[in-house]
Regions:
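A ligand-binding cleft/hinge motif common to bilobed small-molecule-binding domains
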Residues: 5, 19-31, 76-83, 101, ...
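Acidic, polar ligand-binding/catalytic clefts
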Residues: 1-59, 133-134, 138-140, 192
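Extended ligand-binding regions for polar small-molecule ligands
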Residues: 50-72, 146-186
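Ligand-binding clefts/hinges and TM-proximal coupling segments of bilobed small-molecule sensing domains
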Residues: 72-94, 130, 134-135, 165-194
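Short helix-initiation/N-cap motifs at beta->coil->alpha
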Residues: 1-8, 52, 91-105, 143
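Periplasmic-binding protein-like
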Residues: 38-47, 126-165, 183-194
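Hydrophobic residues within well-ordered alpha-helices
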Residues: 10-11, 45, 60, 107-108, ...
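Bilobed "Venus flytrap"/periplasmic-binding protein-like clamshell domains
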Residues: 22-23, 41-99, 119-123
Length: 194
């Protein structure tokens, strides 16, 4: 099911939960409740591996950025803008794309200077294509990935959060994080986010 269709179906009550690593945003929290977080969603910039001119947040000033339309990437831009302002810089041209693979294609081909993504997505593409992409610095504060339930479905929210708590206590959550994300996230909130 397409991403936007999944969100609409959950909001309409067609589904009880979206068990996928959804990034929590203020807008999403207005419509959905989130199970206890399963991973970090701090955003980092990703650059071309051969472009050594982009080493710090300050170096991003005035550069062309690609983001996915309607995404958490777009929602994190005010944080990036504030970080740039602290260095005396400004947010450059922002190009919105329908999907993340298109952003990476244009970044690889030099049509963009950088893109931003959560640590999981950023590390994944850098690991898969280290000669093409390189990981930059954080461009946002803390953020989280979690499963969504319809707003007010407290029974399901607590049930799924209890499952995550058991996984955390047993060490299985850290094992799965290491296996799939390349690192464990020990500093996540331990309660649902509503």
């Amino acid at each position: 099911i397409p991403w936007t269709g999944m969100l609409a179906a959950l909001a309409a009550g067609k589904y009880d939960a979206a068990v996928t690593g959804t990034i929590m945003t203020e807008d999403r929290l207005k419509a959905y409740d989130f199970v206890t977080p399963i991973a970090s969603a701090t955003h980092y910039f990703v650059r071309r591996a051969g472009d050594n001119s982009l080493q710090s947040v300050a170096d991003l000033s005035g550069k062309t950025l690609g983001v996915q339309a309607g995404s958490a990437q777009l929602a994190r831009l005010p944080e990036l803008k504030a970080l740039l302002a602290q260095t005396g810089g400004t947010l450059g041209k922002v190009v919105e794309y329908p999907s993340t693979p298109e952003i990476y294609a244009d970044l690889a081909n030099g049509r963009l200077d950088y893109m931003i993504n959560s640590i999981i997505g950023a590390q994944s593409v850098v690991k898969e294509r280290p000669k093409v992409f390189a990981l930059g610095q954080p461009v946002s504060g803390a953020g989280y990935h979690g499963w969504m339930v319809a707003k007010g479905n407290t029974d399901l929210l607590n049930y799924l959060s209890g499952f995550i708590a058991q996984m955390r206590t047993s060490g299985r959550l850290a094992e799965l994080q290491n296996k799939w994300f390349g690192q464990a996230f020990d500093d996540l909130p331990t309660t649902p986010v509503t």
